[in-house]
A protein has these predicted regions:
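N-terminal loops that bind phosphate or other acidic moieties
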Residues: 1-362
Length: 362
């Protein structure tokens, strides 16, 4: 499928993009959802974080009658020029191979999503190949980013176009009836780009946020950390704004995910975040548009060292602590299942009045 329509921000400059404003979720609805939870025949706050999260989802959707049965996972696939520096175990050909697997519904996230009735939507936003892949949405901005040790990863125009693509896809999904979306990605080298983005935005050292990715050796990890450190120093990224950081050391997948987070806030669609790649994009989005985080649902806390720092910076509390590092959106899809379970209680459980028991009071 082609991304034929011009993105929402297609002709915007960075300054014009910055003029957009995010409206907050509906606080009145949030209170109604919380009030309904208290009427259910269970201990007060018995579902813990899930009561807060469902109230957030209701506030985002603007209704206490919450319907998130139609779920989608946007999988942004892109290559990263920084792989030239030996920061990964595999080459860019793997991005294309996994994207094809996603199109056939064969990858990990696709199998998980299919098991719960969620739809996976692979998106070519920057694979380093001119091959057209049946089953993958062709939204290519360019054929991968540049090696950011030699030059900025993207141009300003490419960065805006990638953000715009993510935002527009959220709108299209909402128009097609999706009630909730999850972030997913595939791109060899994207734990390097996300580490660089995270270190710059949180003003911390490369070694604090750069992990082994798909399983680097000690030597490989040291090389990866040095690459991130060099980029931070070369471009003085600790003093750069979020857009400049994204453009300089980010990836097209991260930019697309950034747009997806922004789109969730603009179109009032709850966005379930996956791991560090998604959370790095979410932090960029929040820095560009304060308030975006109110539209984001955390899923899991992975084993990459940046995970805790990103969650803290976003003031989000992931509920799954399983040491996962698979990527693709797998943690977010797991969260879909937990949300469905919580919603089965919220929408169907007996109330105190129905079982003729006095309601607990706060």
């Amino acid at each position: 499928m082609e991304c034929s329509e011009k993105p929402v921000f297609h002709n915007y400059t960075v300054r014009e993009l910055a003029l957009l404003r995010i409206t907050p979720p509906d606080e009145a609805v949030r209170k109604l959802v919380k009030k309904h939870w208290d009427t259910l025949a269970k201990p007060l706050d018995g579902m813990g974080s899930f009561e807060t999260i469902t109230a957030q989802i209701g506030a985002i959707l603007g209704t206490e009658v919450i319907d998130i049965r139609k779920k989608g996972v946007l999988l942004f696939c892109a290559d990263n020029g920084i792989v030239e520096e030996g920061v990964t175990q595999s080459g860019q050909e793997v991005t294309l191979a996994v994207a094809k697997s996603m199109a056939r519904k064969g990858s990990s996230v696709c199998r998980m999503a299919q098991s719960i009735g969620a739809e996976t939507i692979p998106v070519d936003i920057g694979i380093n190949s001119e091959e057209s892949i049946p089953g993958v949405w062709n939204c290519k901005v360019c054929s991968g980013t540049r090696n950011f040790l030699k030059e900025p990863a993207m141009t300003e125009e490419e960065t805006v176009r990638a953000i715009a693509t993510g935002t527009r896809l959220v709108r299209e999904c909402k128009e097609k009836g999706y009630g909730i979306l999850a972030t997913g990605e595939m791109g060899i080298g994207n734990t390097t780009t996300s580490s660089a983005v995270t270190a710059a935005l949180l003003q911390c050292g490369a070694e604090e946020v750069t992990g082994r990715g798909a399983g680097l050796t000690d030597q490989g990890l040291a090389r990866k950390q040095q690459v991130v450190r060099t980029a931070l120093e070369t471009y003085d990224l600790w003093h750069a704004d979020a857009f400049a950081v994204l453009q300089t050391v980010g990836g097209l997948d991260i930019a697309g995910l950034t747009g997806m987070c922004i789109g969730g806030a603009l179109w009032h669609v709850p966005i379930v975040l996956d791991g560090v790649i998604s959370m790095a994009a979410a932090l960029v989005a929040e820095r560009l548009f304060p308030g975006v985080r109110e539209y984001l649902i955390p899923s899991h806390l992975g084993k990459e060292p940046a995970a805790v720092k990103l969650a803290d910076a976003l003031q989000l509390s992931p509920v799954i602590h399983a040491g996962m590092a698979l990527g693709e959106g797998t943690g977010a899809v797991m969260m879909f299942t937990l949300l469905d379970m919580a919603m089965s209680i919220y929408g169907q459980s007996a109330t105190f009045s129905e079982i003729e028991v006095e309601q607990y009071r706060r």
